[in-house]
């Protein structure tokens, strides 16, 4: 028996969204990775195609969680992938975009694949070095980079800044203009954590701390964020607050943006933040009470005018059914709209990884 999970890869002009799908067999500890490739143009759309990659671990969602940034990276005419195999080893792969043949490398590193939090995040810098961070759920920073540009050989683990790297969860890389990289992670625990931000300079070939505490949970809560860097280089950041380890304490949707690679932050109306951002000075894109089945860690984007769009779901007070929503700013004010018509109720309760009946958008 096979379960199918697929995500399209679309390319439209200069915009690219890339991810991968999997086919899972319930009686085996691994699954086949596949790519679904598709190109959308103004003239015609092509049918997607499947590209088999290899066997990956499947007893948890560690290879498929939505907060991996990124597990699939394209630079020039080459594409890179990362995943855990059936034995928990970190595997890297690359291929030419016009080829279905992957070159795979089982690295020297393993992860605790039984915990779906312990994802792999990777990114290529402007010189072609591959940067990876992996296997975190309140652990010391695990970070390494390739030994040479465009190779699958990884060097030893190393520190980035050697400051506040002992309790890391949700590592994420983002490309910046000029080939530099942004790296964010949570320092602390669920309900008691802060958002930390680093910047990698290709010129200096080193990491620098941008924000020791960008979003401060004040030892009372933490932010579960989603981040997007638009074509102009503006960093868009949105998040929900969580008061405790329990998912039902998720509440509200907040927003901030930066035009200078994370140094200075603003609200959507242009007002400058006094950092760090806390509960009392955050901009609230939408007020959503606790116990609303509000999901954390979803997706966001921005239009060509730099206006943010956030995809999420929650339940209205007079309903038992969570609905998908789009929350956006039009340059003047915030809006939100229900974009689904679901009929099946469910509840988000308790701590840990949940078996959720609908996907994070």
Residue ranges: model-predicted function:
Residues 46-361:
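Extracellular, repeat-based ectodomains that mediate carbohydrate processing or recognition
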Residues 1-47:
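Bacterial Sec-dependent N-terminal signal peptides
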